UniProtKB/Swiss-Prot annotation:
Phenotype of null mutants: No visible phenotype. Embryo lethal when associated with disruption mutants SUN3 and SUN4.
Lineage: Eukaryota, Viridiplantae, Streptophyta, Embryophyta, Tracheophyta
Organism: Arabidopsis thaliana
Renumbered residue ranges of the record's region Disordered: 345-367
GO cellular component: membrane
PANTHER family: MEMBRANE PROTEIN CH1 RELATED, SUN DOMAIN-CONTAINING PROTEIN 5
Domain of life the protein comes from: Eukaryota
Topological relation to the membrane, as annotated: Multi-pass membrane protein
Protein known as: SUN domain-containing protein 5
Length: 561
């Protein structure tokens, strides 16, 4: 973009210079036709004015850039034009360094005018020659999708597969991302790892918070990944996003078509950078692999744990490559770049200015064509060799798959025969099963009806339960009231009993007293002792008898109650 901007700026300056020259020539012709005699009579005055204007414009030109000077085109003279050319060559040194002889002494249309003024002084007219346009590798990569870098964004293009410089096609997802054959979602899995490793299957997932963890002190750290399919592996990407751990430094890759395997085919040794981001590593030569073994040789830093978050494998499987060869054949080798010709309208208008360099450019073009033909021949030969080898590998893999399919087909036929032999028994079993199913359906219907009845009875029971509960609550309230009445009666009964006991004691006392009196009277009478009349009048016997009788009756009533 910078070179294109410089070329456009040089073309603009060249246009401005030609416009100034033409305008100055027109003014000079008109001025010469109308006032030629005036110049002849006052050459000294014109020379002084010319020197003064040259000094003034030279001072002004140092304080303004090309765009500021372009606003005053009508006020420029030939000295300012040469000054502008000098400033242009200082701003664009690449154009002046490559073309050292682009300034020519040429007599133009202004020669006649200046001969009248400066006495046959030749005009130094500078021609700005556009630099040769060289197409860089980045430009070709931007214009031709076959040139793709193996960085993180190298696998994001449109289409089902993508060509790279060595002719390998990458299988892509529908969204344009690379098809990861080491993804757990595609069917890949970890089949083996060292015994100290923890979370080995985490490298196949998308959760960066989970990772493979190994103590850094372990010497043999490895993990064996079974890819989703037998793949022509071309690129492997790894990453470690765990901050408090050591990053992998040197690691090696090896592969095999079967597992377990005693012979692992080396795929390459690589050195990773000490960064917390995904890094891409391209195999020196793509290899057909089903099992990929990753050996972690060394690490950065001195942390206790060495972790690994992501392992991704990109390439193309045999079926995908065959489909690409059948339906999307490449017309040109992927390593042969297309030569881009850059032609603009300004170059067509400047054909007369470049006429002096036509022969030289033609010679360089012929030499470049010869060189390109040699490179093209070498690339075509290399691509044909690689294509033949690649097709041989694809054919080998397809033959292995065909043999495997034949073996599976024979096993399938045996299993079908066994199933046909067992079909009558299976039919009987199916009939029995159908009978049992019908019986079960009838039982289920009966159970459903019984369930409905039970639910109805349960509802009735719930109603009865609520009724009984209300009655029990009323009985409980009556019982509490009755208990209070009983307590009152018990208290009254205790009072009555205490009173009865007092009456009984008093009655017993009087009974004893009356008995003693009557007995003593009879003893005195028996012993002949006389009782005076006065004493009998004071204590008559009939009174004591009444006291004894009443007290006895009270005691008898109390005992009966």
């Amino acid at each position: 973009m910078a070179r294109r901007g410089s070329c456009s700026t040089i073309c603009l300056n060249e246009k401005l210079q030609r416009f100034r020259i033409v305008r100055i020539s027109d003014k000079a012709d008109n001025f010469n036709s109308r006032s030629g005699s005036f110049f002849e009579r006052s050459i000294s005055l014109v020379l002084l004015l010319w020197c003064f204007l040259f000094l003034v414009y030279s001072k002004l030109g140092q304080s303004h850039d090309d765009y500021g000077n372009a606003d005053r085109i009508g006020n420029y003279t030939d000295g300012s034009v040469s000054k502008t050319l000098n400033s242009t060559s200082s701003v664009f040194p690449q154009a002046t360094e490559k073309e050292n002889n682009f300034c020519l002494l040429r007599k133009g249309q202004l020669q006649d005018v200046y001969e009248h003024v400066l006495v046959n002084n030749a005009l130094l007219i500078c021609k700005v020659v556009l630099p040769e346009r060289r197409i860089s590798k980045k430009t070709l990569e931007a214009r031709d999708p076959r040139y793709v870098n193996l960085e993180d964004k190298s696998l994001k293009v449109n289409g089902s597969s993508q060509l790279v410089n060595n002719g390998t096609r990458y299988r892509l997802e529908p969204d344009g991302n690379g098809y990861n054959y080491a993804s757990a979602m595609k069917g890949a899995k970890v089949v083996d790892h060292n015994k100290e490793a923890k979370g080995a299957s985490n490298v196949l997932g998308k959760d960066h918070d989970k990772y493979l963890r190994n103590p850094c002190s372990v010497s043999d750290k490895y993990v064996v990944i079974e890819l989703a399919e037998e793949t022509l592996v071309d690129t492997v990407r790894i990453a470690n996003f765990e901050h408090y751990s050591s990053n992998p430094k040197e690691f090696s890759l090896s592969g095999s078509l079967s597992f377990p395997s005693d012979m692992w085919t080396p795929a390459g040794s690589f050195a990773a950078a000490n960064v917390k981001q995904i890094q891409s590593f391209r195999l020196p030569e793509p290899k057909w692999l089903r099992y990929l073994k990753l050996n972690l040789v060394s690490h950065y830093g001195s942390e206790f744990y060495c972790t690994l978050s992501v392992v991704e494998v990109f390439g193309i499987d045999a079926l995908e490559q065959m489909l690409e060869d059948l339906f999307v054949p490449s017309e040109t080798p992927p390593s042969k770049p297309a030569m881009v010709e850059l032609k603009t309208a300004d170059e067509k208008q400047d054909g007369e200015i470049k006429s002096n360099r036509t022969d030289q450019i033609g010679k360089e073009t012929e030499a470049q064509k010869k060189k390109d033909d040699v490179v093209k021949t070498i690339n075509i030969i290399g691509d044909k060799k690689y294509e033949v080898k690649e097709k041989h590998n694809v054919l080998k893999v397809m033959m292995q798959k065909v043999k495997l399919i034949e073996m599976n087909l024979s096993l399938l036929e045996d299993s079908v025969k066994k199933m046909n032999d067992k079909q009558p028994e299976v039919s009987l079993e199916m009939k029995k099963t159908l009978v049992l199913v019908e019986k079960s359906k009838a039982d289920i219907r009966e159970i459903t009806e019984w369930k409905g009845k039970m639910e109805k009875e349960l509802r009735d029971l719930e109603l009865w339960k609520t009724l009984v509960a209300s009655r029990v609550e009323s009985l409980a309230r009556g019982n509490s009231a009755l208990r209070l009445d009983v307590e009152k009666i018990v208290k009254e009964q205790a009072n009555l009993e205490s009173k009865e006991l007092g009456v009984l004691l008093i009655s017993l006392f009087f009974v004893v007293l009356a008995t003693i009196r009557l007995v003593s009277t009879r003893l005195w009478a028996f012993l002949g002792m006389s009782i005076t009349d006065k004493a009998r009048s004071l204590w008559p016997d009939s009174g004591w008898v009444m006291i004894l009788l009443s007290s006895s009756i009270m005691i008898f009533i109390h005992l009966l109650s």
